[in-house]
């Protein structure tokens, strides 16, 4: 099929990114590079021009440790692969998160106090209070080691992170996003960025804004509109998480800043993420994109693995302007990867898999799981459409990991539906989970439960 876009096609957005969350021993963290590379090549084909990765301090005793060096080396290999394809590197920059052995003498409190409406969320709570004696010195040490570790990478963007991980609820740091967070930037991030990465651009992330403090997004929007934080050339907004995105949609980008999004395309629908196969969110993404119009300048979708490959494609399609909506994007995805001339049945199957994605996961008294989709009525039809497509495909398309995760999702859900929603009741479901384990490289004993399919449960 000849290309439909003219050769002079102008990309819609300037930041066509993807965030591969390389942690928890998920696919991006553990899979062999020869399996990761084809997915990065796909991103380049779709129009991606920047790739964000993460090295989180709370998992290491130092960024000079052998374990940190090992992970950093992997990230650099991913960056090098991307660079060969014209994709620029980006990194998450934690504000006040410390190392695994962070001293309790400088620990940031995270309980509810003052204006806080929830405790500060973090996985390991290794945050450092910048206002305690020695706190800012330790934050600077963490940042310097981080910048030194990646000083041989031409990082284009750093996404400066306030929460998850990050934050401090003490009186001296409150309100964190307007006070302690800014103090850390001024006294640690700013001078070290100038020293190590003077040409890098800074993205201010609003992840978890308005979860801990009321009106956080609104106050940020007002502060930016008034010209504050001129170093924040980009602002990362989050759908359905606070006030910043709705204000941007209604009034435009504040003070001419470039606003980008951070679509959550991996975790929605329940744990374990990707544990049942593909998790298409194409209609949800359409709602997101249509809610803000053309005010955004791209984004970094949040990927925990390749089970959301079709969601990545839809996001890149939106950023590039290649398709009018996600339905058209899915049609082209089905034609290109699976060699199917009539994409309508599989488009319908993808939509049904999205409808049946959201599920309740319970552990029964005997230890077995019960997994109940909230809208199970469409499971049989999705299964019929997917298995009929599988029967018509050639062997190469059938073996494609992009297809296997769709096929396995339809089969697993059908087996749940016909076996009282208890995975252990179906030998066929267990066989599918084993295949997902192999696809995700979940046999690494260090893998976290959140990204491990529920084999044997």
Each PLM stretch: what is its role?
Residues 2-50, 54:
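An acidic-aromatic substrate-binding cleft motif
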Residues 12, 140, 147-148, 292-294, ...:
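Short, surface-exposed loop and linker segments with low hydrophobicity and enrichment for Pro/Ser/Thr
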Residues 21-23, 37, 49-56, 61-343, ...:
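Catalytic-core regions of glycoside hydrolase
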Residues 303-308, 323-457:
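C-terminal non-catalytic alpha-helical accessory regions
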């Amino acid at each position: 099929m000849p290309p439909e876009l003219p050769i002079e096609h102008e990309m819609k957005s300037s930041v066509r990114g993807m965030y591969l969350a390389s942690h928890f021993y998920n696919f991006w963290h553990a899979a062999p590079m020869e399996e990761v590379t084809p997915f990065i090549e796909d991103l380049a084909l779709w129009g991606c021009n920047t790739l964000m990765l993460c090295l989180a301090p709370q998992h290491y005793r130092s960024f000079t440790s052998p374990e940190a060096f090992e992970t950093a080396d992997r990230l650099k290999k991913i960056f090098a692969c991307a660079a060969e394809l014209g994709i620029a590197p980006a990194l998450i920059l934690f504000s006040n998160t410390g190392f695994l052995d962070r001293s309790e003498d400088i620990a940031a409190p995270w309980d509810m106090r003052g204006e806080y409406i929830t405790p500060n969320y973090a996985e390991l709570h290794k945050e450092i209070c910048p206002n305690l004696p020695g706190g800012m010195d330790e934050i600077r040490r963490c940042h310097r080691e981080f910048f030194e570790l990646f000083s041989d990478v031409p990082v284009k963007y750093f996404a400066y992170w306030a929460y998850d991980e990050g934050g401090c609820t003490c009186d001296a740091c409150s309100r964190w996003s307007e006070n302690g967070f800014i103090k850390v930037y001024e006294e640690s991030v700013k001078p070290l960025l100038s020293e190590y990465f003077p040409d890098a651009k800074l993205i201010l992330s609003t992840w978890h804004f308005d979860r801990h403090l009321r009106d956080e997004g609104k106050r940020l929007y007002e502060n930016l509109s008034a010209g504050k934080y001129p170093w924040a050339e980009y602002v990362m907004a989050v759908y359905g998480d606070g006030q910043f995105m709705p204000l941007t949609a209604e009034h435009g980008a504040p003070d001419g800043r470039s606003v980008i999004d951070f679509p959550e395309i991996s975790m929605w629908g329940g744990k374990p993420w990707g544990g049942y196969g593909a998790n298409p969110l194409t209609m949800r993404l359409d709602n997101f994109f249509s809610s803000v119009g053309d005010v955004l300048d791209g984004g970094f979708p949040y990927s925990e693995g390749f089970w959301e490959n079709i969601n990545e494609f839809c996001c890149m399609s939106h950023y590039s302007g290649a398709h009018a909506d996600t339905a058209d994007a899915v049609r082209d995805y089905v034609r290109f990867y699976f060699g199917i001339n009539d994409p309508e049945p599989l488009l319908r199957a993808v939509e049904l898999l999205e409808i049946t994605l959201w599920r309740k996961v319970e552990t029964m008294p005997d230890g077995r799981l019960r997994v109940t989709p909230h809208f199970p009525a469409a499971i049989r039809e999705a299964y019929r459409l997917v298995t009929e497509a599988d029967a018509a495909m050639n062997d190469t398309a059938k073996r494609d990991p992009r297809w296997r995760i769709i096929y396995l999702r339809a089969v697993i859900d059908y087996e749940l539906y016909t076996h009282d929603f208890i995975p252990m009741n179906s030998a066929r479901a267990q066989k599918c989970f084993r295949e997902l384990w192999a696809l995700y490289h979940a046999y690494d004993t260090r893998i976290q439960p959140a990204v491990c399919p529920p084999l044997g449960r």
